[in-house]
Amino acid sequence: EKKVIVQRIREIAAYKSESPLRKFRSVCVLLLSTMVVYAASPFLTANASTDSTYHFSGENTESINLSSHFNGTNGSFVLYDTANDHYMIYNEDLSTQRVSPDSTFKIYSGLFALEEGIISADSNERAWDGTLYSIDSWNQDQTLATAMQNSANWYFQELDEQTGYPALRGYYTKIGYGNCDLSGGIDDYWAESTLKISPAEQVILLSDFLRNKWGFDPENIQAVKDALFISNTDIGTLYGKTGTGSRNGRNTNGWFVGFLETDENVYCFALNMQDSGGASGSAASEAAVSILHDLL
């Protein structure tokens, strides 16, 4: 997956020039109908949302039309300018609709395992047990970085099993991850099952992750960040994770979430697409990279 994204970046860089990010004029106000108000940053809470929808409210947003990047596929895109506290959103209704995170959950599965001491920044290789998978890159020992890049399910399933339900529930609740519903089973609660999250929440979580709002070990935050590295591009350093959800043998849910670091700013983003068969992590990453080159 990483190779596909890097190749797409090179193709776009070859024919697209940089364009300035649109300027915003309003002041950000993010309010949730709970007892707690975080004036310094956007936040989320399960009490303010239903299982299927996240109630995101903010004045400092700009709606943009990116339909040409989706080629008829239903989807949404959220970009958060962390330096200026600004949002750009395509398809606001879908940006708050919660769907399965699929492999994007691995960002936090790895982080929780680090916090639990199951793996460490310096020691995170796990041995392949010999099970033959249809994806060749899974059929080998994995580190946190290679497992993230190869999206090796077995690696993160092992981490979750060792972390265990009680700790996982505690961590997901602590960071406010979507609906925090792990009832679908420890092996696949994240794969078109019970755990759901919206693109808007994905972006907020990434911002919280980079600021280490949760007070985790900074070394663990850095280890996950390093594992998410994709490439140095002409517009900045790109980090991210794809996700693909399938139903009845067809790819119906595609994710690409991550952040782009420039010399002066960090942009967190999430792209999700829904389709009867054409949505995938690779399609989402291709669209997101193209959008980033257009906007930044």
Descriptions of predicted regions:
Residues 1-50:
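Hydrophobic topogenic segments
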Residues 46-67, 71, 98, 161-166, ...:
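Structured C-terminal helix/loop/strand segments within mature extracytoplasmic catalytic/sensor domains
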Residues 71-81:
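Short N-terminal helix-loop-first-beta-strand/juxtamembrane motif that initiates sensory/input modules
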Residues 83-96:
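Short, conserved catalytic-motif segment at the N-terminal edge
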Residues 98-123, 147, 202, 269:
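Active-site SXXK
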Residues 115-131, 217-221:
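Short, well-structured active-site flanking segments
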Residues 124-140, 146, 163-164:
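Acidic helix-start/capping segments at beta-turn-to-alpha-helix junctions
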Residues 143-144, 158-206:
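Mid-domain, small-residue-enriched loop/turn segments at the edges of structured enzyme/sensor domains
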